[in-house]
Amino acid sequence: MATTHLDVCAVVPAAGFGRRMQTECPKQYLSIGNQTILEHSVHALLAHPRVKRVVIAISPGDSRFAQLPLANHPRITVVDGGEERADSVLAGLKAAGDAQWVLVHDAARPCLHQDDLARLLALSETSRTGGILAAPVRDTMKRAEPGKNAIAHTVDRNGLWHALTPQFFPRELLHDCLTRALNEGATITDEASALEYCGFHPQLVEGRADNIKVTRPEDLALAEFYLTRTIHQENT
């Protein structure tokens, strides 16, 4: 598929298991309505006209993905993921073709809104380093004493943000930063942290707080509520 400088490739690392969900089924394959969480997450990306391809990195032993309609979608590419998220993202970047910019989106974050995605993608016109969707911290934050469930002190929440996805960067820059961070043993918790490690300062694009990641059992019902509400709003 031919690409232009405006075209974007999305990478979805989906090789994880998610033990906190307390289920034998990987969380991305749990269902909300008639689709899996992974399908909801990917369809939100495919809905934007600039996203020409989505690369999904799955576990080499994954037998579930082939059973989904996504497996035969013409804009979907599947690659083997790695042991860590960064390894899966790097595998996805290698299959991103000529796209100059890439989105990275959590497989278990199904409630992405199109207006948030559009504002994030607009960074390609104004930024050289990209940025992430994020939500300002609203709750009081506590720091625990080391090794204890006891409060050490209250953390000033001014300037604190919850990092969300998608995260959006120039493809070559993200590749180089992830590679360097992994080679030097840095702790990488998301793609932005790799750029931070290399001295860059990605932008924060405020996104909706209901763009939740399904991590624990109680998140499933909340995500279902948000998705049902969104579908109702779009149909009225």
UniProtKB/Swiss-Prot annotation:
- SUPFAM superfamilies for this protein: Nucleotide-diphospho-sugar transferases (SSF53448)
Q: Where are the residues marked Positions MEP for the nucleophilic attack as a site?
A: 157, 213
Q: Keyword set for this entry?
A: Isoprene biosynthesis, Nucleotidyltransferase, Transferase
| CDD domains the record matches | CDP-ME_synthetase
Assigned EC number: 2.7.7.60
Q: Which InterPro entries match?
A: IspD, IspD/TarI, IspD/TarI_cytidylyltransf_bact, ISPD_synthase_CS, Nucleotide-diphossugar_trans
For this chain's UniProt record, which GO biological process terms are given?
isopentenyl diphosphate biosynthetic process, methylerythritol 4-phosphate pathway
Site (Transition state stabilizer) found at 20, 27
Indicate yes or no for the key word Transferase.
yes
What top-tier enzyme class does this entry carry?
A: transferase
Q: Which reaction does it catalyse?
A: 2-C-methyl-D-erythritol 4-phosphate + CTP + H(+) = 4-CDP-2-C-methyl-D-erythritol + diphosphate
Q: Which GO terms describe its molecular function?
A: 2-C-methyl-D-erythritol 4-phosphate cytidylyltransferase activity
Question: What pathway is it annotated to?
Answer: Isoprenoid biosynthesis; isopentenyl diphosphate biosynthesis via DXP pathway; isopentenyl diphosphate from 1-deoxy-D-xylulose 5-phosphate: step 2/6
Q: Which protein family is it in?
A: Belongs to the IspD/TarI cytidylyltransferase family. IspD subfamily.
So what does this one do?
Answer: Catalyzes the formation of 4-diphosphocytidyl-2-C-methyl-D-erythritol from CTP and 2-C-methyl-D-erythritol 4-phosphate (MEP).
Q: Which NCBIfam families match?
A: ispD
- Quote the subunit structure annotation: Homodimer.
Under which name does UniProt file this protein? Answer: 2-C-methyl-D-erythritol 4-phosphate cytidylyltransferase
Q: Which gene encodes it?
A: ispD
